[in-house]
Amino acid sequence: MRTANEYEIAIFKKEYCKNGEVRISIGKDFEVDVESFEELLPGKIVSSYATGNRDIENSFIMFRVCDVIKDIQYFPVFSETVGRKMLKSWNKPVPKKRSIFIEDNNGVGRGNGGTGNGNKNNVENSKLRSLILFARSLMILHINDPQPMNGMLKEIYEKLELHPYWNVRNYEVKAVNTAIGSFLRKDINVQNENFQNLQDYILYLQTNVTGRRLRNTNFDTLRNIMRTEYPAEQVYF
């Protein structure tokens, strides 16, 4: 199934995103799932599919909308408030919010899409998920129209989240490291802050984001896991 082009997205916005009533009809006319529910950096803004490309702050919900007849998929983005209303109307649950920040109560027991990871997860499993979330945050730092998470990162993240006791493999850490390195060489990074590695980005966050607690940023054990099999690999985190 191919992803919609700009023209098809414009038509989709016009026909299905102009108000609450037509947004609800998305669930009737297409197959719909939540692609991601993500918290943004303080002050970070992304564009909504809602009429007028309204700015979204704080967090967004991205859907995967499949037109099975035309074999086209869309990834509309809405504010958390709008997205929650859509999910409620379709009787669909709100998934966990992905965030590089730690809430005071960690979202445990809220039952409404909190960020809690449970009580006794595999430590490296949790750290690799955190690493992926920091990588994702970096990759959309200067993006106004976010696209789905990098396919390999998404696959690994969802596996780790589904199986919190899964023992992290060295090739999984290497795949995340490779994705980070690939992004760092892209123009969108080079022409802005030009971070040389993920630690540069974490330092940027520690300097520029106040009043929020970051997830654990000590990834030493993950580096060691990767180096046991790939000692010559350049580390980007």
Regions found by a protein language model. Give the residues of each.
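Extended, alpha-helix-rich binding/interface surfaces that flank or overlap catalytic cores
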Residues: 1-237
